């Protein structure tokens, strides 16, 4: 019997990236998706992260577990701390959006490139990188860029133009041991990236699926 993975996402444009990652890495897994767009709607509407956010996250993760999930992946990049706080009450492995990517980045070296299309996502990722560095006594340097003009384009449905803008920005970030893409919705752009020797590109969905497979399937 295949293992069931619950994917909880606040944006529907993350679903294709997650499906691609599972197809590439762990096609035998059964993936069940739970979408709650209200999380980002409220976060972007000026509320930020509130007590209600934690309560709703607890409900979502518990629902996914109750639906038979053997492991859970949450896709929203700005809710990492919320996921980490709530998952202590969940009995199956739960990954926040970025943690596996950060672990792989530090395994690859100490010079990081970080590319996002939303400043809020960038800051959350930078905070998580710094926290990992402090907790594991691993120094690092990084270059960062927000390709903010690409965000409204993908929200309008123009994935092709969005992906080309992300690829153009990525191809300028060469002086690093790895390049991290800060949002699930950026994953489709990777196929357009130039092949730069010695600079692997890390995406949140692919690194997360690799870690879940390692934890659950060996």
Language model regions located:
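Non-catalytic structural scaffold of enzyme domains
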Residues: 1-218
């Amino acid at each position: 019997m295949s293992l069931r993975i619950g994917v909880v996402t606040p944006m529907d444009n993350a679903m294709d990236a997650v499906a691609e990652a599972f197809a590439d890495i762990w096609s035998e897994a059964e993936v069940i998706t739970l979408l709650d767009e209200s999380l980002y709607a409220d976060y972007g509407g000026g509320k930020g992260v509130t007590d209600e956010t934690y309560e709703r996250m607890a409900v979502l993760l518990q629902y996914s577990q109750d639906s038979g999930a053997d492991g859970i992946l949450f896709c929203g990049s700005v809710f990492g701390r919320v996921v980490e706080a709530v998952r202590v009450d969940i009995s199956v492995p739960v990954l926040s959006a970025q943690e596996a990517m950060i672990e792989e980045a530090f395994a690859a070296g100490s010079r990081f490139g970080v590319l996002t299309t939303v400043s809020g996502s960038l800051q959350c990722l930078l905070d998580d990188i710094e926290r990992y560095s402090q907790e594991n006594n691993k120094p690092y340097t990084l270059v960062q860029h927000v390709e903010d003009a690409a965000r409204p384009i993908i929200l309008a449905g123009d994935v092709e133009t969005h992906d080309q803008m992300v690829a153009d920005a990525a191809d300028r970030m060469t002086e690093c041991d790895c390049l991290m893409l800060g949002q699930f919705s950026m994953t489709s752009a990777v196929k357009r990236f130039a092949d730069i020797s010695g600079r692997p590109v890390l995406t949140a969905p692919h690194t997360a699926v690799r870690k879940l497979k390692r934890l659950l399937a060996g």
